[in-house]
């Protein structure tokens, strides 16, 4: 830790001074701050350079003995973009619409897949910040501030500045007391065995606990929480309770409807439409942790309510068919949640395995420092936040254009973390690392 902090200080001081003198503009460079800004700048430039492309899709509504459903035309021979895009001049689309109106239609295939999702791991700080950003719209800084109040003043949650998502066996042994304290207010959300059945190795693993374990409620039932404190406490409680719930099970059905005669018949063009529908089989842990109300699938025309009983070979009537104007979308701007994830996984972009492995544990920054890094970019004018979205400013773009690749990529952090790992194993000296 001492080596890391001293080296960070030297890099920040020397590079910041050099670029400030070279440009007559006060600039700040940091081992974590600058690669994080580089990700924002790369995204900003991609958004500015983006030119939307207009295209057409064809949507049809079918009706048979089991009910109505909607589908989107696709070319099975084209893999790009699912084969759904047609030129905007409308010539090809008009020909397809005319053919489809003439029918007939029949279901060519029905495929169902079941997806089972286990309950999520407990919160470390970064995951809590991501979750609060998605559900509450909070910045990483605000989440940390409220979590600190819950920990220091209200004694309601455990230490929040943790990078672990597991519990030690000793802490897990206290969970029955925690659940007992939660029962009066939260008992309706308990699954069978909550607080009685010990959590398994997915949650309890001494080897995966660093200095501090995952964030969980304490056995102290909090009182007089303000609105913000209650909202964050609610997330922490629900995440713990979810651990005793079962998997979330959903069944996704994909139907291909062929129009234009019996599929495969010679001399006939067969147009195919894809329809998909998802049905929750078992809510499981999502009964405790529902997704944000704002989280919706993109309108790709394929996700639809499918009537039960659809089967291969069933004849369908074409009720309606039309082309729909669409356009490609620019890359999405970072939010606190997605930028925290990008920082956490930055090492995966490194080609050299040793450097990538060295960053697996922390990525860029640590859970305790990432919120501060984001706020530093904002206060120094390198980035700005509009609603939940981050964007790089002109000042930030200028800085990234000036600094060398080695400083704005995660490689510097990777090299340092590899050297510091050697120091922890007793394979080197701090003085040598500092001189290098």
Where are these regions (language model features)?
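Hydrophobic alpha-helical segments
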Residues: 22, 26, 47, 172-174, ...
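Short, His- and charge-rich active-site/binding loops that engage polyanionic ligands
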Residues: 279-293
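Phosphate-backbone binding and catalysis cores of DNA-processing enzymes
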Residues: 1-114, 195, 209-279, 283
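Short alpha-helical scaffolding segments that buttress acidic/His motifs in well-ordered protein cores
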Residues: 7-10, 146-147, 434
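Structured DNA-binding interfaces in DNA transaction proteins
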Residues: 87-232, 240, 244-252, 263-265, ...
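Non-catalytic DNA-recognition/assembly elements of restriction-modification systems
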Residues: 411-436
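Glycine-centered flexibility motif
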Residues: 12, 30, 284, 313, ...
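Short amphipathic alpha-helical segments at helix boundaries and their inter-helical linkers
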Residues: 11, 47-53, 155-161, 429-432
């Amino acid at each position: 830790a001492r080596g890391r902090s001293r080296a960070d200080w030297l890099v920040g001081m020397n590079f910041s001074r050099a670029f400030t003198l070279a440009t007559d503009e006060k600039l700040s460079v940091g081992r974590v701050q600058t690669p994080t800004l580089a990700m924002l700048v790369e995204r900003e430039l991609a958004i500015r350079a983006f030119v939307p492309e207009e295209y057409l899709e064809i949507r049809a509504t079918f009706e048979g003995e089991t009910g109505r459903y909607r589908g989107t035309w696709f070319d099975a021979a084209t893999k790009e973009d699912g084969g759904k895009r047609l030129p905007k001049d409308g010539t090809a689309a008009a020909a397809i619409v005319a053919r489809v109106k003439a029918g007939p239609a029949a279901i060519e295939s029905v495929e169902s897949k079941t997806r089972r999702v286990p309950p999520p791991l407990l919160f470390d700080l970064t995951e809590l910040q991501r979750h609060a950003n998605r559900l509450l719209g909070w910045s990483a800084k605000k989440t940390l501030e409220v979590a600190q109040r819950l920990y220091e003043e209200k004694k309601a949650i455990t230490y929040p500045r943790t990078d672990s998502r597991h519990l030690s066996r000793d802490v897990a042994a206290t969970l029955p007391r925690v659940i007992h304290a939660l029962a009066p207010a939260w008992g309706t959300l308990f699954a069978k065995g909550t607080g009685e059945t010990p959590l398994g190795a997915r949650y309890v693993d001494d080897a995966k606990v660093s200095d501090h374990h995952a964030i969980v409620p304490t056995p102290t039932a909090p009182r007089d929480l303000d609105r913000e404190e209650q909202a964050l406490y609610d997330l922490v409680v629900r995440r713990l309770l979810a651990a005793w719930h079962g998997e979330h099970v959903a069944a996704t059905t994909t139907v291909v409807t062929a129009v234009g005669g019996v599929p495969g018949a010679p001399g006939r063009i067969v147009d195919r439409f894809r329809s998909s529908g998802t049905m929750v089989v078992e809510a499981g842990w999502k009964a405790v942790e529902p997704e944000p109300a704002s989280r919706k699938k993109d309108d790709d025309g394929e996700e639809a309510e499918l009537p039960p009983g659809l089967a291969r070979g069933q004849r369908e009537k074409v009720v309606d068919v039309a082309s729909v104007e669409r356009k490609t979308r620019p890359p999405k701007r970072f939010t606190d949640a997605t930028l925290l994830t990008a920082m956490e996984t930055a090492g995966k972009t490194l080609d050299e395995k040793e450097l990538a492995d060295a960053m697996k544990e922390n990525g860029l920054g640590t859970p305790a420092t990432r919120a501060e890094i984001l706020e530093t970019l904002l206060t120094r004018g390198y980035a700005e936040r509009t609603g939940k979205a981050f964007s790089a400013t002109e000042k930030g773009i200028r800085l990234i254009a000036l600094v060398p690749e080695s400083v704005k990529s995660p490689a510097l952090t990777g090299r340092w973390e590899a050297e510091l790992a050697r120091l922890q194993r007793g394979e080197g000296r701090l003085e040598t690392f500092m001189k290098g």
